[in-house]
């Protein structure tokens, strides 16, 4: 059984989707990030970075519990555990990992910053600085959308012919 500690955010949703698609048994536990629950001692023992999502696999690789934090690491772990969505063939595996890291290192952070500057920054830094952030991160988000559109024009899924963890990310 896998315990999923998460909240209704893009990073949390990608792991929830992956768990559903793999069919691995799991229990979901809400971590209310608005109330700061991600900073509790309990949660930080699972996710030292104090960010959701995190999982605890009660039946880890050696039969003992293992905790995994960071959405990309969780997707890889779950794919390997389930034997699905991460190809074994080296070129296909590299492609899936490239697109996974493209998402967790680029798309997620850029979209998060665009959202922050669009919705929250004006009150903290003023309209002029907030507008700069909105322009910068929206431009980068649009560039990333174009990269994804181009890739999906070449293949049915981000990493090629088959669905992979890159598509869940």
Region spans (language model):
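Aromatic-acidic/polar surface patches that form glycan- and anion
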Residues: 8, 64-68, 137, 141, ...
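Generic secretory/membrane-interface signal
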Residues: 35, 92, 143-144, 161
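Amphipathic alpha-helical segments that form well-ordered structural scaffolds
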Residues: 18, 140-143, 147
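GST superfamily/GST-like fold recognition
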Residues: 106, 110-115, 158-169
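GST-like domain detector, emphasizing the conserved glutathione-binding G-site
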Residues: 1-135, 149
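Hydrophobic alpha-helical bundle segments that form small-molecule/ligand-binding pockets
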Residues: 145-159
């Amino acid at each position: 059984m896998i315990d999923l500690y998460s909240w209704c955010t893009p990073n949390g949703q990608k792991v929830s989707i992956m768990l559903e698609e793999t069919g691995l048994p799991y229990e979901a536990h809400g971590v209310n990030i608005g109330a700061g629950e991600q900073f509790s001692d309990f949660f930080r023992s699972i996710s030292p970075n104090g960010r959701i999502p995190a999982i605890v696999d009660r039946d880890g690789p050696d039969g003992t519990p293992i905790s995994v934090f960071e959405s990309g690491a969780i997707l890889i772990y779950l794919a390997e555990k389930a034997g699905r969505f991460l190809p074994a063939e080296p070129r296909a595996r590299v492609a899936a990992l490239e697109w996974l890291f493209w998402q967790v290192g680029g798309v997620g952070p850029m979209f998060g910053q665009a959202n922050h500057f669009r919705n929250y920054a004006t009150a903290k830094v003023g309209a002029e600085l907030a507008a700069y952030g909105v322009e910068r991160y929206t431009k980068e988000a649009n560039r990333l959308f174009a990269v994804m559109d181009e890739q999906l024009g070449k293949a049915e899924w981000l990493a090629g012919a088959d669905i992979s963890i890159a598509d869940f990310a």
